[in-house]
Amino acid sequence: MAIVSAEKFVQAARENGYAVGGFNTNNLEWTQAILRAAEAKQAPVLIQTSMGAAKYMGGYKVCQSLITNLVESMGITVPVAIHLDHGHYGDALECIEVGYTSIMFDGSHLPVEENLAKTAEVVKIAHAKGVSVEAEVGTIGGEEDGIIGKGELAPIEDAKAMVETGIDFLAAGIGNIHGPYPENWEGLALDHLEKLTAAVPGFPIVLHGGSGIPDDQIKEAIRLGVAKVNVNTESQIAFSNATREFARNYEANEAEYDGKKLFDPRKFLAPGMKAVQGAVEERIDVFGSANKA
């Protein structure tokens, strides 16, 4: 099915009691790993770039072109959305212009009325080009590209107002955070999520900070209305651990590898790529989106 807007497959997840994964990429290798995992599991997927990752990769146009061409060259058949994660207003508009098929405008750091007004503007522009829109109310804990949130519970009335702007799916704070969860984390506020989904019945909710949340809590959140779960830190840890292990083994057994040119980055990065693919496949299974393409 190739490159598509995320609206239909996220809504299908909401209606059928599973969630799709929004997996952040940081380079060519991660993008390949995510695509391989999605194809192997026959799962729809959003490949996401944060503002920082896009800058690192050479800009939004480079990211859009990379993902689009890999989908074609790798023969990917599952639905893939190219999604901006936590974008400022100008970044959201740029991504719409260069060919992203889904964007998140994050105005959660703005006064509520300004957030709503700017979101409505983004929705009008995006929908005119068939681009799906995610927005946020409350703030997600942790730090994302310099935006620091304390992990608020999204106000119900603000969530209802945000849905009325015409967005396609809503990120709302329910005690979740970006990055590793501390030992004293109290868990998702599932009672608040239940109130939230009752206020916007049938509307897809997005769970940010999906890495490190116990599987039973994720599954209960999906049962209550979460239809998209974002994952980044988990993939980063998997990649880092596998790459470090490869380096340790190489240094300890250098003679064994003599002549194999393992200094070649294509070989050096391979274990990390495989680890990311494995992590993504495992999350797809937990989210219930395998064989939903």
Swiss-Prot record:
Pathway: Carbohydrate degradation; glycolysis; D-glyceraldehyde 3-phosphate and glycerone phosphate from D-glucose: step 4/4. The keyword Calcium does not apply. PROSITE patterns: ALDOLASE_CLASS_II_1 (PS00602), ALDOLASE_CLASS_II_2 (PS00806). It is an enzyme of class 4 (lyase). InterPro entries: Aldolase_TIM (IPR013785), Class_II_FBP_aldolase (IPR050246), FBA_II (IPR000771), Fruc_bis_ald_class-2 (IPR011289). Keywords: Glycolysis, Lyase, Metal-binding, Zinc. One of its GO terms (biological process) is glycolytic process. Binds 2 Zn(2+) ions per subunit. One is catalytic and the other provides a structural contribution. It catalyses: beta-D-fructose 1,6-bisphosphate = D-glyceraldehyde 3-phosphate + dihydroxyacetone phosphate. Zn(2+) 1 binds at residues 86, 178, 208. It comes from the Bacteria. Dihydroxyacetone phosphate binds at residues 179, 209-211, 230-233. Gene3D superfamilies: Aldolase class I. Catalyzes the aldol condensation of dihydroxyacetone phosphate (DHAP or glycerone-phosphate) with glyceraldehyde 3-phosphate (G3P) to form fructose 1,6-bisphosphate (FBP) in gluconeogenesis and the reverse reaction in glycolysis. PANTHER family: D-TAGATOSE-1,6-BISPHOSPHATE ALDOLASE, D-TAGATOSE-1,6-BISPHOSPHATE ALDOLASE SUBUNIT GATY-RELATED. This is Fructose-bisphosphate aldolase.
